[in-house]
Amino acid sequence: MINVDTTQLHYVYNRKIIKYAHIDLGTKCLLECPMCPRTEHPEIIEFSKRTYGEVKIKDFKKVLSYAEHITFCGNISDPIYHPKMLDFLEMTIKYPKHRNVYIHTNGWGRKQKWWDRAFDLSKNKVKWTFALDGLPHESHKYRVNQNGEEVWEIMKYAKSLGVQIIWQFIPFKYNENSIDEAVKLAKEYNIPIKLRRSSRFADRHEHLDLKPTAEVLWLDKLEFLQKNSKDRKLKPPKEKIQIGKTSFKTEKSLYKELKPT
């Protein structure tokens, strides 16, 4: 399934350029996250299998002809499970120098040989985002079937090779008190960490035992201010935000990479 991000659509009519393409390569994922559409609505997966199947190389080539930047990020799949993912990655980096590649993954289920090749292809224009929701030993509480400790080893390995990576950390009830320690751990290995609010609690009456509380809800408050302000371009407050014992600057973006001050 290939989607064009309409908020970032940029046609130059004489060249027919699409600025960003978001690609969901198929329907496969090894995890069973409680609030994922895969878990809650398995009929969607069956429909997608019948209707779309997996992205084929011939179709991917068409995307490369038009898209400047590529994001591999599954709504119902994880890109690393596509059997041709390394081929797609190799094809992408051979295109013009201005092309950037973003890969979002839970990072679990591939053998070392696969990662060796993936990271060898990722030295320049590729940025990986690993979803590790909590400290390595606790991420599986939401990302069911994930071995967070092995994913953390893969992340450290990637960093040691000079690969660009980000640690994406979604606050939940079980991990909100681990944020300080996670920030220290990320800093120790010089890995940027991003706190990202889950939108899947909206209008929901189940899984409330997972919903974070206290200071981490500043993300919800900030989004509320943005949506309800007369000035739709309202910027986040410039003062520091305190989460646990760690303070963060909040300029630029609601979902920015958070770096300890």
What are the functions of these language-model segments?
Residues 2-127, 138-149, 153, 189, ...:
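Conserved alpha-helical substructure of the radical SAM core
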Residues 74-76, 103-107, 130-134, 169-171, ...:
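A cross-domain feature marking catalytic cores of carbohydrate-active enzymes
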Residues 88-92, 128-131, 176-196:
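Short, electropositive alpha-helical surface patch
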Residues 155-178, 198-200:
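Conserved strand-turn element in the central/C-terminal portion of the radical SAM core barrel
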Residues 174, 194-223, 244:
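Flexible glycine/acidic-rich beta-alpha junction loops that bind and position SAM and/or redox cofactors
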Residues 237, 244-251, 255:
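C-terminal accessory extensions appended to soluble enzyme cores
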Residues 256, 260-261:
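Active-site and channel-lining beta-strand-loop segments
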